[in-house]
């Protein structure tokens, strides 16, 4: 009952999901053809198929490719390009980790590109302040050279990418940002 409702919903969906229907039916046919008589072996065989569908895309191509003799692999590659977010979850390599103890390491480009105030705010230049200056007006170039604050999400991300060494208070002689390190008139 539930399988027929699911199949009807898949058929009613747009053309993007039609190759998935072909993939599921051909995989089911091949599994039924190669089904073993022992029930414990059958559950192991089908459990392997279920885990491979949930796994990432490269392993999915290799495991289903053994079952389907080439046709399913081409369909899967076609679907993987159309729906990348279903097969590959988004991953951002934000931090570096040391090989010995697994501690987080600082991403050096963050230290070079951004300035962290002691209050936790991050300063950056506007995007594109070095690019294609020949076609930008003088006023626009001046606006792009200005420093702006990073948003809350960006600040949290940058804090993850740096260690506590870069979050300590520094007392530089003649620091132009000395008066901005502490937030005043801030009600918490």
Curated annotation (Swiss-Prot):
The keyword Ribosomal protein applies. GO terms for biological process: mitochondrial translation. Gene3D superfamilies: 4.10.410.60. Keywords: Mitochondrion, Ribonucleoprotein, Ribosomal protein, Transit peptide. It is found in: Mitochondrion. One of its GO terms (molecular function) is structural constituent of ribosome. It comes from the Eukaryota. GO terms for cellular component: mitochondrial inner membrane; mitochondrial large ribosomal subunit; mitochondrion. Pfam families: Ribosomal_L35p. InterPro entries: Ribosomal_bL35-like, Ribosomal_bL35_sf, Ribosomal_bL35m. PANTHER family: 39S RIBOSOMAL PROTEIN L35, MITOCHONDRIAL, LARGE RIBOSOMAL SUBUNIT PROTEIN BL35M. Belongs to the bacterial ribosomal protein bL35 family. This is Large ribosomal subunit protein bL35m. The lineage of its organism: Eukaryota, Metazoa, Chordata, Craniata, Vertebrata.
């Amino acid at each position: 009952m539930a399988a027929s409702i699911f199949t009807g919903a898949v058929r009613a969906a747009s053309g993007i999901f039609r190759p998935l229907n072909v993939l599921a039916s051909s995989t089911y046919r091949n599994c039924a053809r190669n089904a073993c008589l022992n029930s414990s072996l059958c559950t192991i065989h089908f459990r392997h198929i279920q885990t491979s569908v949930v796994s990432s895309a490269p392993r999915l191509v290799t495991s289903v490719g053994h079952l389907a003799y080439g046709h399913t692999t081409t369909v899967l590659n076609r679907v993987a390009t159309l729906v990348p977010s279903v097969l590959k979850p988004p991953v951002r390599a934000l931090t570096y980790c040391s090989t010995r103890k697994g501690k987080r390491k600082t991403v050096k480009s963050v230290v070079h590109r951004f300035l962290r105030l002691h209050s936790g705010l991050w300063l950056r230049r506007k995007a594109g302040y070095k690019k294609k200056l020949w076609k930008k007006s003088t006023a626009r170039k001046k606006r792009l050279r200005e420093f702006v604050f990073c948003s809350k999400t960006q600040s949290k991300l940058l804090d993850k990418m740096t260690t506590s060494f870069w979050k300590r208070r520094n007392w530089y002689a003649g620091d132009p940002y000395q008066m901005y390190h502490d937030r005043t008139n801030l009600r918490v």
